[in-house]
Each structure stands twice: as structure tokens, then as C-alpha cells.
Regions:
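Conserved ABC ATPase "signature" region
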Residues: 103-120
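The feature captures the beta-strand-to-loop junction immediately N-terminal to the Walker
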Residues: 33-35
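Conserved beta-strand-loop-alpha-helix hinge in the C-terminal portion
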Residues: 204-223
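Helix-to-loop junction immediately C-terminal to a conserved catalytic motif
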Residues: 48
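Catalytic Walker B motif of ABC-type/P-loop ATPase nucleotide-binding domains
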Residues: 149-152
Length: 223
């Protein structure tokens, strides 16, 4: 269980997040939606430890997660994927910063196969399509054994086929017990992928509902 309790963040005098609380269970895919500049991406960066909160607590499995420990539990996939990809090949990307062992190499190969990237293992990440880069970023998160994955606009710039491919892979990960949090403005992707929505508005958690009403979700994304 991931739990967020009364999270606060300010930049100078501007309070970006105010008293945000929610929890997520293994297997959930949750959309984080709301207007631009509402605090959604800030929330993602706080969860993953890229930013430090000014108040509140983030817990996983009932234990508080200090900022320094979050990267091993919560993996944040940015909207600008090119800024996260440094390897000379897909395999190299997965193994960057790690001591390569036969077991680790086998796991990397298994993940590339799982995410339909095995045929591109020796290619440079820059040559991949947007959808393929998203799947590579997911593979990196899984190799680091992150039980929680936060994606910031994962379908931005993707065509319908690649969007559906990413959605399918997220469902596969959720079935394996991962918690998926997806910051998105993409109504079609949220409806196809997520079962629940958290609505961030003016830095607060304005709503939290199961996605069984497309009109309610549409209204939340437009306000």
C-alpha cells in the first residue's frame, strides 16, 4: 500500500500543494488529472524524491519513505524521456550504473522481451519511436524493481496504436502487483487504462473517484 498523508510543497511564498492525502493499493492504475499548473507534476516529483516536501508523510507498506529511499520504491518517468536515456543501446540503458552479471543480463533480456523491445536491443535509444521509448523507460523501472511507477504524460505525442500499446503494458504491470500513477491530460488513455482518478486543483486533492463515468472524468480534466 502506498499512502500519502497531508503533503505540502511551496516554492517561495507560493503554496503548490496543500494538505494532499490519498492511498493506492497494489494493482491499481490511477490517473492524476486536473488543470495545467495545478501541482500534478510537482506531486510526481515529490513521490519519487526528485523534490523534498515541506510537510506531510509518504509511506509504503506502512513505513515512512525518506526522500533518499524513494528512488528504490517509486520510479518517476518524465515527460521528456530523452533527458532520462543515456545508454548507447537498449541493453546498455538497462544496465547503466550497475555491475553486470549473468543474472542481471538475463533479467534485462527478459524485460526487453516482455515489453516487445527484444528486436531493438542493440539499437540506440534515440532511434526509437515515442511508444518504444516509453516501454524502455518502463523496463528500466522494472529492472530497478520499483513497485510504484509514476508516469508524467506517458502518451504525449503518441499515435493511437502506440497509446494502446503503452496502455496494454501498464495493465500487464498492474496485474503483476505494481501500483501505477499516471499524470495525464489524455482522456482516451485515462478511460482505457485507469480505474480511478485523483483530481488536483489549485494544489489540493479536489476529488477522488472510480472511473465509471466518462462525463465526470471529462469535466475533471477540463476544469
Amino acid at each position: 500500500l502506498l499512502s500519502v498523508e497531508r503533503l505540502h510543497k511551496r516554492f517561495g511564498l507560493h503554496e503548490v500543494l496543500k494538505d494532499v492525502s490519498f492511498s493506492c493499493s497494489p494493482g491499481e492504475i490511477v490517473a492524476i488529472v486536473g488543470p495545467n499548473a495545478a501541482g500534478k507534476s510537482t506531486l510526481g516529483k515529490l513521490l519519487s524524491g526528485l523534490l523534498k516536501e515541506d510537510g506531510g508523510t509518504i509511506r509504503f507498506a506502512e513505513k515512512p519513505l525518506k526522500k533518499s529511499r524513494r528512488r528504490g520504491v517509486i520510479w518517476y518517468i518524465m515527460q521528456d524521456l530523452d533527458s532520462q536515456l543515456f545508454g548507447e543501446s537498449l541493453t546498455d540503458e538497462l544496465l547503466t550504473g550497475k555491475k553486470e552479471t549473468p543474472t542481471l543480463k538475463l533479467r534485462a533480456d527478459e524485460l526487453l522481451t516482455l515489453l516487445n523491445l527484444a528486436e531493438f536491443a542493440d539499437r540506440h535509444p534515440a532511434t526509437l519511436s515515442g511508444g518504444q521509448k516509453q516501454r524502455l523507460a518502463l523496463a528500466v523501472a522494472l529492472l530497478n524493481e520499483a513497485p510504484v511507477i509514476v508516469l508524467d504524460e506517458p502518451t504525449s505525442g503518441l499515435d493511437g496504436r502506440n497509446m494502446r500499446s503503452v496502455s496494454k503494458q501498464l495493465h500487464t504491470l498492474a496485474q503483476k502487483g505494481h501500483i501505477i500513477l499516471m499524470i495525464t491530460h489524455d482522456l482516451e488513455c485515462a478511460l482505457a487504462t485507469c480505474s480511478r482518478a485523483l483530481v488536483i486543483r489549485d494544489g489540493t486533492l479536489a476529488d477522488d473517484f472510480q472511473i465509471d463515468d466518462a462525463w465526470r472524468l471529462m469535466a475533471a480534466m477540463r476544469e
